[in-house]
Amino acid sequence: PLLSTISILGTAFAITMIMAIVITWQTKYADLEPEVNRSRCLYFSAMHVQGKENKDWNNFGKPSAAFMKECIQPLPEVEACTAFSTADVALVSLTDGNNRLKVDAMSTDPDFWKIFKLQFLDGKSFTEAERGGDMQSVVISASVARKLFGTTEAAGRQMLLNREVVRIIGVVKDISVTAKDAYAQVWSMYHSNELNVTGWWSYNGNRTIAVLARTPDDFPAIKQGVEKRVKDVNAGLEQRQIDIMEQPDNIVAHVNHVWSNIGPNLPMLYLQYGIALFIILLVPSLNLCGLSNSRMQQRVSELGVRKAFGATDGTLVRQILNENLVLTLIGGVVGLIFSYLAVYAMRTWLFTNSDNIGTAGDFSLSMGALFSPAVFVLAFVFCLLINLLSAGLPAWLATRRTIVDSLNDK
């Protein structure tokens, strides 16, 4: 019982660490509400403007809505594209100045609601028809609506956004800060002037651009199409040229594209994850291998008797692996539960980045990331690997002994 308990706890420890990595990966990169189209999206989050003749003149920043309009929207492979700002602190209140709140607000465009799927509790999303009206239209989160009006039925009401009267046209369910691109508490539309091109500076802005492809197979065509249009734009510029620095990025590159002047090192990222998983698998497996070897030494005589009655080495190894698999699966279930607790306890640390530091929202975890079939399948696969590594070698060594040696327990 003691060895079995230690074996279960050892397996649980390994599975806890492995599945914490898997769940974190799922939360950052998988198709999860509201960012349900990550696998079909490409992203632009950096822009480099350089002098044509004077290469020492450089300006690094973010792309603009005008860049999206000129170089991305016309491509036939693009189903939708949106330009949005990072959620920033804003002040909202009732029109009489009461119930003042600090909120996280972003400005975007109508295509935002085609790419990101937020759940509307009241009203609807804004469209091009609302752009440029007498009063700006906004969408707010349920928590902001409740704090301002005491109810989520706030569509049609007015409030102050940074001391400007705006009209609320929709209320959405709160989303987690872990939704890197979609997260905000108030969504408004940027001014149509941002779409106009007046010079090279028009392509430099403060936007991140998400591009929804019809299928991931269209990614190469979109990349080539954007590169061609950038080349055409540069041909028309006199002193400057724009450089998209090997963008667009897929979701993994996008999340890890921290600096505007340096792209992400994806091979190193994958290598780090691979080394971490290898070490987490290997070290507990070696310890469990020693425990399994101790159990095998206690069963040498039993194995000798079974071989004497005709059991083959392969049959004995399979039986031992099956017996050990029960303990491994128990440890796997315990480890999976512990991994949920660990990720929940460390969620703020795991998912805080340069964009969401100081945000007012909650770092809640998606049920899709925690309870997706992929998580359970991977947990089972890692259990099988640990079982094979920890019990396979001792079982093979034990069955290699002759019948006489086994019966004499030498």
Describe each model-derived feature in a short phrase.
Residues 22-148, 152, 161-166, 348, ...:
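Structured, solvent-exposed hinge/loop segments at the ends of secondary-structure elements
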Residues 232-276, 298, 346-375:
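Membrane-helix entry/capping segments
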Residues 109-125, 136-262:
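Mid-to-C-terminal secondary-structure elements
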Residues 19, 23-26, 142, 340, ...:
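Transmembrane alpha-helix boundary and packing residues in multipass membrane permease domains
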Residues 2-6, 10-14, 301-347, 378, ...:
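Transmembrane alpha-helical interface segments in multi-pass membrane proteins
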Residues 1-14, 21, 35-38, 316, ...:
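Alpha-helical transmembrane segments of integral membrane proteins
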Residues 1-29, 262-301, 329, 385:
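Hydrophobic alpha-helical transmembrane segments of multi-pass inner-membrane transport and secretion
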Residues 9, 28, 372-410:
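C-terminal membrane-exit region of the final transmembrane helix in multipass inner-membrane proteins
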